[in-house]
């Protein structure tokens, strides 16, 4: 932390997901506008942004708009898919939609979520409980009304001159960057640095040390440290 204390490093995540009051609409353009205002107000040429999954897509969209305020963008598993499933069918959302109205307390959510992920509770009950609590707090509209369209990542990549690092997971374990998408991104911007991880979609959780080595490489490469 001391080494990078002179930098401004921001983890980009989705407003409304436990981090703000409920929103009228959940979409990347809405999220982007909220965070753009922050960077326009607090100008600093040494900003770095990092995002995971939808947060990575948001960070990449944001980079195109506020590039002059950034040194680099680090993307963990952006969903660079040509087609994206309906949000109501994605991940645990069918279970949440069916059961959330029954959760009167956080304990209800934890006990019910055990039915969906018994292995997760056996392996790491603390982490699994936190996941259940996140779903308990989240606005139900995040699971039912999220307006999402595939990202035009090629155009964004082509437009950027800042450093771009991408952490890519194993497709067979739940990764969301197909080989074709990786190739298209590199065709658009040959300076993008990809690193492959033999993990599922949550690289930071599954391969923490290797993940942070890659983040350090990104920060060192993007600065004069």
Residue ranges of model-derived segments:
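Catalytic histidine-centered segment of alpha/beta-hydrolase-like enzymes
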Residues: 199-212
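Active-site loop/oxyanion-hole signature of alpha/beta-hydrolase fold enzymes
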Residues: 8-50, 213
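Conserved alpha/beta-hydrolase catalytic His-Asp/Glu region
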Residues: 85-86, 100-159
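Gly/Ala-rich beta-loop-alpha elbow adjacent to hydrolase catalytic centers
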Residues: 51-55, 59
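Conserved loop-alpha-helix segment in the C-terminal half of the alpha/beta-hydrolase fold
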Residues: 164-199
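Flexible "cap/lid" loop of the alpha/beta hydrolase fold
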Residues: 64, 73-102
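Alpha/beta-hydrolase active-site loop signature
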Residues: 14-18, 80, 200-203
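Short amphipathic alpha-helix adjacent to the substrate-entry channel of hydrolases
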Residues: 1-9
């Amino acid at each position: 932390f001391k080494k990078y204390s002179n930098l401004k490093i921001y983890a980009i995540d989705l407003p409304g997901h436990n981090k703000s009051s409920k929103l009228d609409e959940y979409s990347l353009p809405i999220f982007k506008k909220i965070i753009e205002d922050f960077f326009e107000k607090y100008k600093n040429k040494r900003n770095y942004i990092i995002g995971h999954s939808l947060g990575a897509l948001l960070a990449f969209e944001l980079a195109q708009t506020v590039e002059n305020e950034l040194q680099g963008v680090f993307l963990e598993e952006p969903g660079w898919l040509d087609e994206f499933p309906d949000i109501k069918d994605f991940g645990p959302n069918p279970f949440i939609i069916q059961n959330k109205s029954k959760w009167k307390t956080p304990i209800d959510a934890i006990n019910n979520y055990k039915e969906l992920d018994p292995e997760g509770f056996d392996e790491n009950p603390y982490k699994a409980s936190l996941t259940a609590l996140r779903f308990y707090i989240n606005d139900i509209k995040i699971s039912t009304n999220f307006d999402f369209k595939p990202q035009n990542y090629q155009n964004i990549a082509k437009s950027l001159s800042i450093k771009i690092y991408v952490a890519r997971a194993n497709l067979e374990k739940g990764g969301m960057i197909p080989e074709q998408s990786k190739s298209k991104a590199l065709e658009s911007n040959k300076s993008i640095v990809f690193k492959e991880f033999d993990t599922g979609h949550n690289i930071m959780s599954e391969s923490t040390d290797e993940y942070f080595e890659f983040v350090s490489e990104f920060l060192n490469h993007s600065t004069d440290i």
